[in-house]
Design a protein with these regions (language model features):
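Extracellular/periplasmic helix-loop junction at the C-terminal end of a transmembrane helix
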Residues: 52-67, 157, 161, 236-245
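Generic hydrophobic transmembrane alpha-helix motif, especially the helices
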Residues: 78, 82, 88, 109-116, ...
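Glycine-rich helix-loop "coupling/hinge" segments at transmembrane-helix boundaries
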Residues: 151-154, 166-167, 181-182, 223, ...
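Amphipathic cytosolic juxtamembrane alpha-helices at the membrane-cytosol interface
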Residues: 86-101, 105, 125-133, 183-187, ...
Length: 319
């Protein structure tokens, strides 16, 4: 009697063809949030102008043409010239680069400081949490712009100092939001299980808690860029921000005050650029918040049942 050894054919691996997190987020943004999509387009144009500013500026941003000062828009100078004959378009494009550096750098520091303070406070709890939160309460009771004006009066006025000041001062206020997210995650059972099997507190914080508050951090980052750009422009307009040699949009608006009656376009172009960029970033940030935060979407998260499917499920169970 002979037996045949039949071997089952190896099962083919089923590939997961679902889109990645960011691609899925982009698809939902385009389909569900038209204003957010508009904001994303503004951000792309704004960042492209900042990154490639040296290649697309018609003239050097400090190049002076005294014989062509205070000219209106023309074929040579598309947006006109300022009081020293410098090309307004070139200075506006270079200002986008300054705003991009301030916005990204300061917001990155915002999130980093918020994680260091908020995650530590929320994870440790107890007296540490109480002491840290009382400090945050006192800090938030002082108007933020007053703090910025005071600090920038003492420190030297340059780009690095501006980024550090905006990043650190803004990050302390954001620590409370990170703390709330950490406390919500810390109550999950897998955190207790990780502690029970001997994981160190640092490993639990870095491996299990921080990755799970990424939606909160992404929302903080996208909403913070516009605020930091606006803060830098406000400080520079008042004379407490960047020095006149750096053509940020706030500096351009400040230098145009003496010519508002005769040449209002000197303030018009940087004002429009500032308003449009901040509006676009805020619309994009609001849309990302709505898409990532289930509480703002009626409790329906990415992997939850929609209202329609939930009703269908209840109807089938009732039968």
């Amino acid at each position: 009697m002979t037996t045949k050894n039949s071997s089952a054919a190896p099962a083919k691996r089923v590939e997961d063809k679902r889109p990645g997190f960011f691609m899925d987020l982009l698809r939902r943004l385009i389909l569900e949030k038209p204003l957010g999509t508009f904001g994303l387009g503004v951000i792309i144009i704004f960042f492209a102008a900042g990154i490639f500013s040296k290649f697309i500026m018609p003239f050097g941003y400090q190049q002076i043409h005294l014989l062509e000062r205070l000219q209106g828009p023309s074929a040579k100078y598309l947006l006109g010239t300022d009081e020293l004959g410098r090309d307004e378009l070139s200075r506006l494009i270079y200002g986008a680069r300054i705003s991009m550096e301030v916005g990204l750098g300061a917001t990155f520091l915002n999130v980093l400081v918020s994680i260091l303070i908020g995650a530590t406070s929320g994870f440790l709890g107890g007296k540490t949490d109480m002491i840290v939160q009382r400090f945050v309460d006192v800090w938030m009771s002082i108007p933020g712009f007053v703090i910025l004006l005071t600090v920038m009066t003492i420190l030297p006025r340059n780009l690095i100092v501006m980024i550090l000041v905006l990043g650190i001062t803004g990050g302390i206020g954001g620590a409370r939001l990170v703390r709330s997210a950490v406390i919500a995650i810390k109550s999950n059972i897998y955190i207790s299980a990780s502690d029970a099997i001997g994981c160190s507190p640092m490993r639990i914080l870095l491996v299990h808690i921080i990755p799970n508050i990424m939606p909160t951090l992404i929302i903080m980052f996208t909403l913070g860029i516009g605020g930091n750009i606006l803060a830098e422009a406000g400080l520079s307009f008042l004379g407490f921000g960047l020095p006149p040699g750096i053509p940020s949009w706030g500096v351009l608006i400040n230098s145009s005050q003496a010519y508002l009656q005769t040449d209002p376009q000197l303030a018009l172009w940087p004002g429009l650029a500032l308003s449009l960029s901040v509006f676009g970033m805020n619309m994009f940030g609001d849309s990302i918040r709505d898409l990532l935060d289930p509480r703002l979407r009626g409790g329906v998260g990415r992997y939850s049942l929609s209202d329609k499917k939930l009703k269908q499920l209840k109807a089938s169970l009732a039968k």
